[in-house]
Amino acid sequence: MVSLLENPLRVGLQQQGMPEPQIIVIFGASGDLTWRKLVPALYKLRRERRIPPETTIVGVARREWSHEYFREQMQKGMEEAHSSVELGELWQDFSQGLFYCPGDIDNPESYQKLKNLLSELDEKRGTRGNRMFYLSVAPNFFPEAIKQLGGAGMLDDPYKHRLVIEKPFGRDLASAQSLNAVVQKYCKEHQVYRIDHYLGKETVQNLLVFRFANAIFEPLWNRQFVDHVQITVAETVGVEDRAGYYEKAGALRDMLQNHLMQLYCLTAMEAPNSMDADSIRTEKVKVLQATRLADVHNLSRSAIRGQYSAGWMKGQQVPGYRTEPGVDPNSSTPTYVGMKFLVDNWRWQGVPFYLRTGKRMPKKVSEISIHFRDVPSRMFQSAAQQRNANILAMRIQPNEGISLRFDVKMPGAEFRTRSVDMDFSYGSFGIEATSDAYDRLFLDCMMGDQTLFTRADEVEAAWQVVTPALSVWDSPADPATIPQYEAGTWEPAEAEFLINQDGRRWRRL
């Protein structure tokens, strides 16, 4: 296996520069995201010599931990979640840059204490006043944390102070607008990094290159040649220990409004004027503003929700959503959402986009598939059984890569055809692992590159698209009316009808 530094895809390319030393302050540092994803991502960047050794991490949470105890907890987390990563001399050096500051989100004294610690660390670690404030806390704490940071003067420098906000950004259009108002009171837009870790995945980033760097595909990327598009993000896990959060969010807020909408934007947007952050995000906003649910007057024809019931996963029986610990037995929270979008613009007029996401599905898989129109006349035997024989599929996870399906003649005397796939896989290069989403996003934020982060108007435009469904689904509902699908199956029957009514079917993955 070769290391990422020896990635053959990077041969001959100039590596991204190294950011300035800075302090990364993680609010909610006692949560599992810190030791599972955030600290490991930063350690990986240090291991690959992508960030300077002066990089400093300060954890903030309510627990009364010491610096040393915080370091011990991060090391335990690394050993548990990333057992294959060597923790030797480099980890010892890296961990000396880990510090902890106990405090309450709503206590001004906590922020003054934090401010004093950061000033001390600037002198000790040589971080030159550069700060990144990462809000890895429950969404209801976002406004208060931002107000307190702003009130303490820790967001005053628009060029040295950056604010990173985890999704979900609001729970509907009104709350997103309210949160944006708080952010804009204390920050310039170029200071704000609204993070969606899906945008850090290699295949998602490659989508822009694939579309706009290859002349053979872009001319086909329109209503003349594309029959429809499917975007799937399927999970095998259930609600697990997130019932408290999930009961308030559901699949639409947790996944579709952010992750799937980002995949949708990159698939449907026009070519940007340049590859700078604002040009790309402006095109994403434009396509969102042209997007609508196919039929807002008869919602069942364009938006379907569902819940998983008891079933079998990998030979083991699993409970239904309503019997999971912490879930209301009469819950109407969707664990599955399927939607049909139409785009009112020149490129995509009349081409449906089908999006679906759900928990307890047969496979963990994320994919975008472009289904091209049929040939005008069927000339070959057995091809008549195939509709949309040409499919371009971009696999986000697992086995990141791209495949193109087309028909070929089967060997033999008869003119019979079958479909074959031409594949590109990142794994075929012998690379141990493609870059993790969080390490790429951390690096971009430290470098001041907002390309993979969402802008205020983009967030609001995405909420606007799904508002017709939210306004209905947020109303009290009879639990008996919520479609069910058995754990280990793909979707409720109503979601099959969503696409079957158009003479199409979901792609089996």
UniProtKB/Swiss-Prot annotation:
GO cellular component: cytosol
A GO molecular-function annotation: glucose-6-phosphate dehydrogenase activity
UniProt-annotated catalytic positions: 259 (proton acceptor)
PROSITE patterns registered for this protein in UniProt: G6P_DEHYDROGENASE
Annotated signal sequence range: none
Organismal lineage: Bacteria, Bacillati, Cyanobacteriota, Cyanophyceae, Nostocales
EC number: 1.1.1.49
Family, similarity comment: Belongs to the glucose-6-phosphate dehydrogenase family.
GO BP annotation list: glucose metabolic process; pentose-phosphate shunt, oxidative branch
Protein residues bound to NADP(+): 62, 104-105, 167
Name the UniProt record assigns to this protein: Glucose-6-phosphate 1-dehydrogenase
Associated pathway: Carbohydrate degradation; pentose phosphate pathway; D-ribulose 5-phosphate from D-glucose 6-phosphate (oxidative stage): step 1/3
Gene3D superfamilies given in the database record: Dihydrodipicolinate Reductase, domain 2, NAD(P)-binding Rossmann-like Domain
Alphabetical keyword list: Carbohydrate metabolism, Glucose metabolism, NADP, Oxidoreductase
Function, as annotated: Catalyzes the oxidation of glucose 6-phosphate to 6-phosphogluconolactone.
NCBIfam families found in the cross-reference section: zwf
Residues noted as binding substrate in the record, renumbered to the chain: 197, 201, 235, 254, 359, 364
Disulfide bonds: none
Record's catalysed reaction(s): D-glucose 6-phosphate + NADP(+) = 6-phospho-D-glucono-1,5-lactone + NADPH + H(+)
